[in-house]
Amino acid sequence: MTDKIDRPLATVILAISADGKIADAVRSPARFGSANDKAHLEQQVAASDAVLFGNGTLQAYGTTMRVISPELVKQREQQGKPPQPVQIVCSRSPQFDPNLRFFQQPVPRWLLTGPDSRHTALPSPLKNGQDAPSTRDEFSCGTGILPVHKRLIENGATSQFDRIIYAKTAGGEIDWIDAFQQLANFDIKRLAILGGGKLVASVLAAGLVDELWLTVCPLILGGADAPTPVEGEGFLADLAPKLQLLAVKQVGQEVFLHYRVDR
């Protein structure tokens, strides 16, 4: 039973179209949410110790959602937290485009992957001849990020991930119970999950999602190939996770739905 293991409280936060899509059929970055939705997402991220998202989501956006509001940064500091939550990329392969803006953002970066990745080279966004950032700039300890000279050394190269978590795998897929237990060992108590649909499906199937925030946006995307909040193999109706509606809030033309997953 997942309620008996030490793990973070996990909340899925997604914006969806009125017909339940999180992106269009060609999987363009989903930027159809309003400024209100973006502010809501930032609030949820600010309330979390870490943010989890899949490699596909990272490739689509190239960046991650960080806390920008001075008020929210101050709230985190008053709670004894670093200015930014940990940003965790989940990927079976550690191969990334080293020039993604994500690797220049002033956030702590972790990689969650399987044991088969241990001997694969990890990305460093520093181009040939480019100097490493000074420990006084965005990589300083004051931002909760390891300075370059303390970053991980993997396969003889400096990785731009501050920590790599090697979770157990089953059938080539991440063992999410093991992964969540490892996150708890690193004092991650609240986890925000931002997609994509395959990752959400895997964590939900493992019984590890506690709450969902869905922003219903006023557009129809359609398309049989357009991704949905929960992909994977799906659930039979009799075995589908049941939800309890906690709150409904309309802001402008959007509706914010807050659910708890029944155990």
Task: Tell me the role of every PLM-derived stretch.
Residues 1-121, 125-129, 137-139, 145, ...:
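Enzymes that bind and transform nitrogen-containing heteroaromatic metabolites
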